[in-house]
Amino acid sequence: MGMAENTNGMEEGTLEIGMEYRTVSGVAGPLVILDKVKGPKYQEIVNIRLGDGTTRRGQVLEVDGEKAVVQVFEGTSGIDNKYTTVQFTGEVLKTPVSLDMLGRIFNGSGKPIDNGPPILPEAYLDISGSSINPSERTYPEEMIQTGISTIDVMNSIARGQKIPLFSAAGLPHNEIAAQICRQAGLVKRLEKTGDLLEDGEEDNFAIVFAAMGVNMETAQFFKRDFEENGSMERVTLFLNLANDPTIERIITPRIALTTAEYLAYECGKHVLVILTDMSSYADALREVSAAREEVPGRRGYPGYMYTDLATIYERAGRIEGRKGSITQIPILTMPNDDITHPTPDLTGYITEGQIYIDRQLHNRQIYPPINVLPSLSRLMKSAIGEGMTRRDHADVSNQLYANYAIGKDVQAMKAVVGEEALSSEDLLYLEFLDKFERKVVTQGAYDTRNIFQSLDLAWTLLRIFPRELLHRIPAKTHDQYYSRDAGN
């Protein structure tokens, strides 16, 4: 027992600095407690060598005098207080980044698992990211086209936005995420006509996909889907499986976002980051908190979970003078379909809206089962309109929302009073409700609609009503779009 000084000494600035200790005093879940440690630093990386010669990595979570609490990324099984030695490196956790990471698959710790060659890093970056001066942030604008009508028309996503998918167990959030990855692209304006087309610079768009706590079937689904549709070359995949160490889920989204920041701000790419499942991340956070015997907050989650989630979500955005952007779509499953659960509740406070996946629509065989009424994109106004999508976009979206909400009310009233008691106007709203769910919401998994097709489809439904009932659309827009053929 005791400590043995490493021959490399304590020379500042080198990776081999630090001391080797054999002073493990306890193990609690994913944590190792060390005694008699000289000068440990918060978030310092340690190398742990077990008695059988295997090595693991850990990170200092807490320092109290000569005591240090270390979270071990690969799990604590096999660690004892007799043969285990711990070396402090003096470095924070950094990940190698390179443009060559596109098209590759990594585990939750950032190590390649696709049998490809090692990554030749162009830089090593701190996984906590660099702090961004708020005054240097650029307001998110310009739309990312997902090819899904309910998102593009009614919940448009701006480049640099963070907007989560609120889902639940058994709902097709993985299929929707894969469809967004397949179809997502940039849009640009043609100077002469003012129209928008899909951006031809496909090499300027990239996707970073991080899966946390997923089962092998889900991991294989995403790998197979990316490879079969040819989008793998612009995707970087990080996979933390359900049987991987829970603690690894704490660093997986941070490694993914560090990679995204390099691709966006150093390589000039517009990066879409998809994180699934943030509920697994929150559970890992709760497990670490319980092991540290912290005072629990709501439902056992730590009181600092809001702050911790913000350190992930707030890494989306755009920076003045940098060409690229980071757009985040975190996916989380609400336990028992409860939107008041701490994870979706706190996520909703931080992010700029949400896309709500509805079980009732799913039970009626509607795909994608996106319920537009509780869904919201707070930055939609800056991503649409003349010069960005089309001048009628905002008006059409508002009118669709209004008519769908009224249609839902009429449907509820019909269940009470019967169809005979409804007015002719009420019947129009019922017809709209049915066609909206069958034609606009319903869409094939491989059915891509650009924003013009989606808007024209919306107009075909709005023409069910006489112009006088379309109160949300100004007369000038009516004159231009109401009477024209849907095909134009």
UniProtKB/Swiss-Prot annotation:
Domain of life: Eukaryota
Intrachain S-S bonds: none
Database matches in CDD domains: ATP-synt_V_A-type_beta_C, ATP-synt_V_A-type_beta_N, V_A-ATPase_B
Keyword annotations: Hydrogen ion transport, Ion transport, Transport
A GO BP annotation: vacuolar acidification
GO terms under cellular component: proton-transporting V-type ATPase, V1 domain
Matching SUPFAM superfamilies: P-loop containing nucleoside triphosphate hydrolases
GO molecular function: ATP binding; proton-transporting ATPase activity, rotational mechanism
Family that this chain belongs to: Belongs to the ATPase alpha/beta chains family.
Function: Non-catalytic subunit of the peripheral V1 complex of vacuolar ATPase. V-ATPase is responsible for acidifying a variety of intracellular compartments in eukaryotic cells.
Assembly, per entry: V-ATPase is a heteromultimeric enzyme composed of a peripheral catalytic V1 complex (main components: subunits A, B, C, D, E, and F) attached to an integral membrane V0 proton pore complex (main component: the proteolipid protein).
Protein name according to UniProt: V-type proton ATPase subunit B 1
Organism from which the protein derives: Gossypium hirsutum (Upland cotton)
